[in-house]
Amino acid sequence: MSSDAAAQERLPGLLLVLSAPSGAGKTTLAHRLREASPDAVFSISATTRAPRGAEREGVDYHFVTAERFTELVAQGAFAEWAEVHGQRYGTLRATVDEALAAGKLALFDIDVQGGAQIKAAWPQQAATVLVLPPDEAELERRLRGRDTDSDETIRRRLVAARAEVARGLGSYDYVVVNDVLEGALAQLQAIVRHERLRHAGRWDPEAARVAEACRRSAAPLGGWAS
């Protein structure tokens, strides 16, 4: 094992929260980051919905009954939870603590409200990133390019996007504009390296430069600035 690889293994765990309006490319970025990071894992949520297709317990979700979910809520077991389309989803505190204790990079693909709750629960170990398309026109183009949604659905998604972006710009640590996928991925990797080194009391000037340029207060927001 090289000295660089050994140093990477000794880095502390990090919770990386990725939030974005639908169509920004967040999920693709999250999977690319996972593939490029040997110690990265996706946070596994608990849910009341039934498994779909090849989904597996403990791999894709923790599948629980509605009654058990209610018990877990009452016990304070969730760092965050929400109801979506009649089913409940939540992040278990124990799962997150295990990832941190193991020195993992835990990836969260959740909305801004959930991300804010993760940040509140682990303020020192969590970094929140808002992923944006270059502007609203590009977001609409991407949504229409899917060719799966009606005009009314796209309209609703754009309204929801404006609200989600406004919430994220008001609270998140970083902003990454996903114009070119590889460039956005490189920015995420720099943010991860900067945050983990910072917690270890170490420094990488280039990672710090890129990460600081993505700070919410410094990031170029393009068509989302108004």
UniProtKB/Swiss-Prot annotation:
Stated role: Essential for recycling GMP and indirectly, cGMP.
Localization terms from the record: Cytoplasm
Molecular function terms, GO-annotated: ATP binding; guanylate kinase activity
Domain Guanylate kinase-like, first and last residues per copy: 13-193
Keywords assigned: ATP-binding, Cytoplasm, Kinase, Nucleotide-binding, Transferase
NCBIfam families assigned: guanyl_kin
Family listed: Belongs to the guanylate kinase family.
Sequence positions that bind ATP: A20, P21, S22, G23, A24, G25, K26, T27
Statement: the UniProt record of this protein carries the keyword Transferase: yes
Pfam families: Guanylate_kin
EC number(s) on file: 2.7.4.8
Name the record gives this protein: Guanylate kinase
Reaction equation(s) it catalyzes: GMP + ATP = GDP + ADP
Superkingdom assignment: Bacteria
UniProt cross-references to Gene3D superfamilies, sorted A to Z: Guanylate Kinase phosphate binding domain (3.30.63.10), P-loop containing nucleotide triphosphate hydrolases (3.40.50.300)
InterPro entries noted in UniProt: GK/Ca_channel_bsu (IPR008145), Guanylate_kin-like_dom (IPR008144), Guanylate_kinase (IPR017665), Guanylate_kinase_CS (IPR020590), P-loop_NTPase (IPR027417)
One cellular-component annotation, GO: cytosol
